[in-house]
Amino acid sequence: MKYVVQEWLRITTLLFIAQAVSAMVLPNATLLEELLEKYMDEDGEWWIANVSRKRAITDSDMQSILDLHNKLRGQVYPPASNMEYMTWDTELERSAESWAETCLWEHGPASLLPSIGQNLGAHWGRYRPPTFHVQAWYDEVRDFTYPHPHECNPYCPYKCSGPVCTHYTQVVWATSSRIGCAINLCHNMNIWGQIWPKAVYLVCNYSPKGNWWGHAPYKPGRPCSACPPSFGGGCRENLCYREGSERPYSPHEPEEETNEIERQRSKAQDATAQSRPRTHSPSGSTGSEDSEKNEVISTQQMSQIVSCEVRLRDQCKGTTCNRYECPAGCLDSKAKVIGSVHYEMQSSICKAAIHYGILDNEGGWVDVTRQGRKNYFIKSYRNGIQSIGKYQSANSFTVSKVTVQAITCETTVEQLCPFQKPASHCPRVYCPHNCMQANPHYARVIGTRIYSDISSICRAAVHAGVVRNEGGYVDVMPVDKRKVYIASFLNGIFSESLQNPPGKQGIQSICCRLNQVDYKTGK
């Protein structure tokens, strides 16, 4: 099951994962603020954890997660007679850390799932404490109806009026008395086909596992009236409590109280990472040794980097004038914006994007579409920018948001964004690794530099030198049909030739390599 809750004002997508259920948080914001500051050193560089460190969560975050779980477990309704006090388990923490490091939006590992419960949460954008996810899991209680004893004959019905309630039931499962969580910063996570540049990933593992089919999460009754004998009659805040169970883990030195983000890397590796896509190396043979013999690396960009003052009239030349990268701080620029919705060609590209609401003052990517002549342009004040009115005919343009979409090795432009006159804006796509090994019958490459729209986008990108076999970001631009597509062998891939394809157009795959994309805003 997959659960999405949209908060209209913040345009936020929520997703949380209990066993066999997924969940996350996507606020429309530009910075990770306080949380990311924890993971940066004094020079502003990402902090690199020491290999010997085992902790993947700070003591303060650990304690807040644990305290909130116990608080919520003690206040269930109807009251629980056998709800056990929850303690921290370092082994569960380590297993959560191991899974968090995979940055996969699914439950795992498969070998542990039969014996543990698991809730997952993630967000990117503005700072959210880990307890935000815990509270959201619990808030599913509004859709859950507790099964009364007379309904359990012998199995209890599962009554959930919302999309999912299993996150809540795992949090309050009476016998799930141990918890261990980890937090990891994941770069370029694939979330339901969307790429999140910097996702903060929370994994919480529970033991013994909950959510057993046909069972209620706890026994109703007077608090602590049905505690297991091993608790010796102890009760704390409506929870069955065993003396000496409050801190079963060893405290760590303050300097080690920080989340592990990446493994130790040498300066040489860091320098290499700045010039290559940050993706995991595929296992096994990739064919890269052979491709080096005919390696062609494209450094041409479809998108253009512009300043706050650049006007579309100055910059828009040729077929590539559709995507621009704007810097931060354009609200302070004196550049003019003429019009509303439709902007005159002498308008600042970046300030028009802010005026329309595509970007904020942090900058980012914007798509531009030329719209031909308009008889007049209306002034308005939006998002901190006053635009100017003009009552003379002039050429115009509109702005739109640049989206990012993950695709497969077989995805084609014909499927993704077919050509439409005068032009089509395709999303920025993220190609997976190992597309060189994809079946060439299902992932064809037709052409050289300009490819037929029935070609595999990702294999064409490898062929063109836009990305390597490790995958990465690619921009594609549908263009009008071509009569001839030329075959060639480049970067380990043979492309096909084709002449006079009926009704087909070409795709111009021009570079946007991963290290050339600045995802400051995720826009």
Curated annotation (Swiss-Prot):
SMART domains in the cross-refs: LCCL (SM00603), SCP (SM00198)
Localization of this protein: Secreted
Secreted is among the record's keywords: yes
Domain named LCCL: residues: 302-397, 403-505
Position of the signal peptide: 1-23
Keywords: Disulfide bond, Repeat, Secreted, Signal
A GO CC term attached to the entry: extracellular space
Composition-biased stretches (Polar residues): 269-288
Record's keyword annotation contains Signal: yes
Cysteines joined through disulfide linkages: C308-C326, C330-C350, C409-C431, C435-C458
Pfam families: CAP, LCCL
Sequence segments annotated as region (Disordered): 246-298
Residue span(s) of domain SCP: 66-206
InterPro entries assigned to the protein according to its UniProt record, in alphabetical order: Allrgn_V5/Tpx1_CS, CAP_dom, CAP_sf, CRISP-LCCL_domain, CRISP-related, LCCL, LCCL_sf
Superkingdom of origin organism: Eukaryota
Matching PANTHER family: CYSTEINE RICH SECRETORY PROTEIN LCCL DOMAIN CONTAINING 2, LCCL DOMAIN PROTEIN (AFU_ORTHOLOGUE AFUA_5G08630)
Family named by the database record: Belongs to the CRISP family.
Stated name of the protein: Cysteine-rich secretory protein LCCL domain-containing 1
Species of origin: Gallus gallus
UniProt lineage: Eukaryota, Metazoa, Chordata, Craniata, Vertebrata
Gene name tied to this protein: CRISPLD1
